[in-house]
């Protein structure tokens, strides 16, 4: 089997050596800035990070059938690739959940320390996946009141989030579907919200940044 691997995926070489008969693999490492269609023409499996955009142009006439991403989420895949049954696609869902939650909690702690917010204020969580669930669990352990909104799971209401002084965003990004998240936080949301701080560790496109700039809200993004 011919493997095409991003050379910045940590520990990949070490893990491959632990696989029985690993010497049967034909391996080529690539720099994510230089990956082209020609590279994919001689590979059966592709291992990437979120820095690689996977689309029809990249995979045209390629024998690749397996794609593994060392990051969570599918934002770097074009929909026509995701919907093509030719490809088996795997992502590392939740792999960075702890790191993201630690960053969010650090932001909240700093805001409390600087007296931008008080510790007993209500927090809102948008998106109840791996990160949202872990954040909620820790907030419960810290006795910090919070509300959750995830329309796909039928949890909460967006209007409830408007009452929260701090909103932390962990939703997946989409422009289509039953509940598109593109510019979910916009002038309509902000106009009726008592929110003072928005922490966005998800995709930037979930925020209408012009609306944020025209508001008094403190916006934190990683």
Task: Label each region the model flagged.
Residues 1-43:
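N-terminal glycine-/charge-rich "phosphate-binding" loop or analogous flexible N-terminal tail
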Residues 5-9, 29-31, 48-51, 70, ...:
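Structural motif
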Residues 7, 93, 119-140:
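Glycine-rich adenosine-cofactor-binding loop
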Residues 10-15, 35-37, 74-76, 154-156, ...:
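Short, charged/polar "capping" segments at the starts of alpha-helices
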Residues 44-116:
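Phosphate/diphosphate ligand-binding glycine-rich loop within oxidoreductases
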Residues 54-58, 152-222:
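Rossmann-like adenosine-cofactor binding region
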Residues 64, 119-123, 195:
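Phosphate-coordination loops involved in phosphoryl transfer and adenosine-cofactor binding
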Residues 141-156:
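NAD(P)-binding Rossmann-fold cofactor-contacting core
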């Amino acid at each position: 089997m011919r493997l095409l691997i991003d050379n910045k995926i940590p520990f990949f070489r070490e893990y491959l050596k632990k696989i029985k008969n690993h010497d049967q693999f034909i391996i080529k490492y690539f720099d994510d800035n230089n990956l082209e269609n020609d590279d994919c023409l001689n590979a059966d499996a592709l291992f990437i990070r979120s820095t690689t955009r996977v689309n029809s142009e990249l995979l045209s006439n390629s024998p690749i059938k397996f794609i593994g991403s060392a990051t969570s989420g599918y934002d770097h895949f074009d929909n026509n690739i995701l919907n093509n049954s030719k490809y088996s696609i795997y992502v590392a869902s939740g792999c960075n959940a702890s790191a993201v939650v630690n960053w969010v909690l650090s932001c909240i702690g700093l805001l409390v320390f600087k007296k931008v917010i008080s510790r007993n204020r209500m927090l809102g969580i948008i998106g109840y996946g791996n990160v949202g669930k872990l954040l909620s669990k820790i907030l419960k352990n810290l006795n910090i009141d919070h509300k959750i909104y995830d329309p796909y799971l039928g949890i909460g209401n967006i209007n409830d989030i408007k009452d929260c002084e701090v909103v932390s965003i962990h939703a997946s990004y989409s422009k289509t579907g039953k509940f598109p998240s593109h510019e979910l936080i916009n002038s309509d949301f902000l106009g009726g919200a008592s929110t003072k701080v928005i922490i966005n560790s998800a995709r930037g496109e979930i925020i209408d940044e012009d609306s944020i700039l025209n508001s008094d809200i403190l916006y934190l993004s990683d």
